[in-house]
Amino acid sequence: MLHGRGAGAKTIFSVEGLLDPGYHVLAITGLYNSAIDGKEWFKPREEIPGEITDAKQFDESERVLTENVEAHISRVRADRSKIFLWGFSQGAAMALILGLRGKVKPRGVVAMSGFLPTPVKIWKKFDTNTQYLLPHGSEDEVLSAESSKSAKSFLESKGIEAEYYEYKGRHKMSLESIAYVNNWILRLSEI
């Protein structure tokens, strides 16, 4: 699970108790200090959601996340068909990147209250085998639900299966949204 901007791995573990007890959760903290406290995966351009200001930070976060996820999969001998990436906000952007690049090859990606980073839109190749769930709060005051709807449209335009789910709430994980994600993961795990 990948946290949002201004948070850290500890915030993710507060959600772990609400998930299916069979899950093994790996949470990684962003590499960079955030201007709003906590950590972040890359420096965003405040005025343009999805834009990044430092491509090196973005690339380094992708590299470190890929290495950590791969090492963890090897260490616990995980079945790749049961690997899911789940990110919130800026962490959702990174989860989308890892899924689309195809290096990690997860079964599914949950990009909650997130956005598709601009660099992705110029890529030529995508891994189309991963399924995506894009939950977003209807009253999100940080990122409009349009950012997830736009990501869904982009994914589908590349032949990638994506589902948008809107829940009542602001820029946070609600009990309703966590339950929906939990059921989605369980459903895909059985296929």
Where are these regions (language model features)?
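Serine-hydrolase catalytic machinery in alpha/beta-hydrolase-like enzymes
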Residues: 1-78, 82
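A conserved short beta-strand
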Residues: 104-116
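C-terminal catalytic histidine-bearing segment of alpha/beta-hydrolase fold enzymes
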Residues: 131-133, 146-191
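Conserved alpha/beta-hydrolase "nucleophile elbow" surrounding the catalytic nucleophile
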Residues: 3-5, 86-88, 137
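Active-site signature of alpha/beta-hydrolase-fold catalytic machinery across serine-
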Residues: 14, 97-101
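Gly/Ala-rich beta-loop-alpha elbow adjacent to hydrolase catalytic centers
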Residues: 87-91, 95
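Short beta-strand/loop motif that positions the catalytic acidic residue
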Residues: 133-136, 140
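Flexible "cap/lid" loop of the alpha/beta hydrolase fold
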Residues: 37-45, 114-132
